[in-house]
UniProtKB/Swiss-Prot annotation:
Gene label: aroB
Protein's pathway: Metabolic intermediate biosynthesis; chorismate biosynthesis; chorismate from D-erythrose 4-phosphate and phosphoenolpyruvate: step 2/7
Protein name: 3-dehydroquinate synthase
Highest taxon of the lineage: Bacteria
Cell location: Cytoplasm
Record-stated family: Belongs to the sugar phosphate cyclases superfamily. Dehydroquinate synthase family.
Chain positions recorded as Zn(2+) binding sites: E180, H242, H258
Reaction it catalyzes: 7-phospho-2-dehydro-3-deoxy-D-arabino-heptonate = 3-dehydroquinate + phosphate
Annotated keywords: Amino-acid biosynthesis, Aromatic amino acid biosynthesis, Cobalt, Cytoplasm, Lyase, Metal-binding, NAD, Nucleotide-binding, Zinc
Principal location class: cytoplasm
Residue numbers binding NAD(+): 67-72, 101-105, 125-126, 138, 147
Enzyme Commission identifier(s): 4.2.3.4
Length: 379
């Protein structure tokens, strides 16, 4: 079964069985297909896929790079660009990114810049990539440790979501995708929280429930992006929790995964929303805390300590260092004015006069961060 369930801002297909020749019908056999992935995915998932494509008559050029956020860099990007040239890849070729969010970001940036743009297809294999990274056309790489500092808007021709890939992942990788779904509930669709509350015990055991969950989240993100494809206003709401999260990832030198960073980032940014007077219901923080904890996700900076090398603790648990890193966030209009998404109530991000992000008072921001770091320093 192939279901084209999203067409705006780009096509997204839901695929129950990846090994279906109909799925590949839009790809020409006249030119090579360039598949971008990492070493792990290439070894664990790609052999049967490459055999299948070979039987369909495709010539596939496989380019891989080492897994992990630390390799989402300019050096990796240039290395892959050089390999495209060495392989004689031309405008007729199509780039396919297959894997998690890091791979899809790299594939998108490559496709958008090589020969000023070649066709791009995305095949997400993690929950985070399925409900977030593959939707919307954003891509990018890190520069000097700062998240997604270089990137473009480049919508894929198609996204193929095949949940059977999730079966190859350890449970913790499934859980790392949950914060993005909870974020969608915070900013746009309160029903997602209700869905998680009602179905959380069966989310990963019922195929029907999992499929509904994935589709719902994809449609939430697609609807937002369709209204603001270039991230001028409404789309910024998708960054809820990410301002703090990106600082966490930067200061941890890549030791904290994106999903765990977003989990803690949402808790901190919701506290800032409350302290700033934008959110009126303090119980919402308790609800968020309980929902994240049910899925064994962290809700405070303190819970990330065991994942960070000891020699980084002093730098990581320092409010001034976090504030300094926040100054480099892409949403900022200036380095001194940190901007972040505020939640008004469940299912609604604050419009902030149409900007959909605001600059919290420095004292509020500092005190919230200080309280997070203080707990660790006193233990």
């Amino acid at each position: 079964m192939i279901e084209n369930f999203i067409s705006d801002p780009h096509n997204v297909k839901f695929v129950e069985n990846f090994f279906n020749s109909e799925l590949f019908s839009s790809l020409s056999t006249d030119y090579p297909i360039v598949m971008i992935s990492d070493h792990y995915v290439a070894e664990e998932l790609l052999p049967p896929i490459l055999d299948f494509m070979d039987n369909l008559g495709y010539r596939v050029i496989l380019l891989t790079f080492p897994p992990g956020e630390k390799n989402k860099t300019w050096e990796t990007f240039i290395s892959l660009q050089n390999q495209l040239i060495d392989q004689g890849v031309s405008l007729g070729s199509t780039i396919i990114g297959i894997g998690g969010g890091i791979i899809l970001d790299m594939a998108g940036f490559l496709a958008s810049t090589y020969c000023r743009g070649v066709p791009l297809f995305l095949i997400p294999t993690t929950l985070t990539a399925m409900i977030d990274a593959s939707i919307g056309g954003k891509n990018g790489i890190n520069l000097r440790g700062f998240k997604n500092r270089l990137g473009t808007f480049y919508p894929p021709k198609d996204v193929w979501i095949c949940p059977e890939f999730l079966a190859t992942l350890p449970k913790k990788e499934w859980l790392h995708g949950i914060p993005e779904a909870i974020k969608h509930g915070c900013i746009a669709d309160a029903y997602i929280w209700e869905f998680l509350d009602n179905c959380r015990d069966r989310l990963f055991s019922s195929q029907e429930i999992l499929h509904e969950f994935i589709k719902r989240n994809c449609m939430v993100k697609a609807a937002i992006v369709a209204k603001d494809p270039k991230d001028q206003n409404l789309r910024k709401t998708l960054n809820f929790g990410h301002t703090i999260a990106h600082a966490i990832e930067t200061l941890s030198k890549g030791h904290i995964s994106h999903g765990l960073a977003v989990s803690v980032g949402m808790m901190i940014e919701m506290r800032i929303s409350l302290e700033s007077g934008i959110m009126k219901n303090p119980y919402l923080i308790e609800q968020l805390d309980n929902l994240l904890k049910y899925f064994c996700l962290p809700t405070a900076l303190q819970e990330l300590g065991s994942l960070i090398p000891q020699h980084l603790h002093n730098e990581f648990y320092h409010p001034e260092n976090i504030l300094h890193t926040l100054g480099y966030d892409k949403k900022n209009l200036s380095k001194k004015a940190v901007r972040m998404v505020m939640v008004e109530h469940l299912g609604r991000a604050a419009s902030c006069n149409g900007a959909y992000c605001a600059t919290p008072h420095t004292d509020i921001l500092y005190e919230v961060l200080k309280s997070e770091c203080h707990v660790v320093c006193n233990n």
